[in-house]
Amino acid sequence: IAAALGIQRNDDPQKLVPLTTLRFGVRADKEGVLLKDFHMVHGYKIADVTERYYLSDAVFLVALESDDKSLLESIASALQNPVYPLYLGRKSCPPTLPIVLGVKGEDILTALKTEPYLYKNAHRKSVRISYEVTSGGAMVQDIPLSFSQLHRKHGWRMKREELLVVDSNPEHDAFSKL
C-alpha cells in the first residue's frame, strides 16, 4: 500500500500514520506452496547466503477497514494506479489482477465471510481467515512504523485466526425435494 501511495522507505515516518489506523484481515482461498529461495550477497572477501521463503500459487482476499472512507478510496485508487511497482516480497512476485474489488461499507469480518471465493475448489472444506481484533487475540508486531533501512520499526496489533467452513455447492440441496 505504501508503494502504491508513493511512500518511500526513507520518507518521514509520519506519512505511515494514516495506514496504521487501518484494520486488516485476510482470507486464504488457496494456501499455496511454500517455496524456499536463497540469495547470495557478495562481500569483499566472503559471500553471505540467506534463505527466504515465499508462497507460490496462493490466492488471498484482503480486507481493509477504516472509519475514514476517503482513505480507503485513495488506497483503492493508488492500488489501481501505483506510484511504484507492486510486488509481494520480491519484485519477481507481482500480485495478480484484480487487486481491488471495491470499497464497501462492511466490516472486515463480514467481508471475509461473504465475499465470493477467488479460487473455486469443490473439495475444500474450510478456509483460514485472520483478522484484527481489539481484544481476545494474539499479539503480533507487524504494523509498519518505519521502512527505513537503518531504523526499521514495527508496532503491535492483536489478531485472531479461525477456520471458516465452506459451503462447497450452495445451489445444490439434495434434500430440498424430499
Give the label of every model feature segment.
Residues A2-G43:
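Glycine/small-residue-rich interface belts in oligomeric ring/scaffold proteins
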Residues R27-L178:
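Internal, well-folded beta-alpha domain core
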Residues I1-A2, L79:
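Hydrophobic alpha-helix position signal
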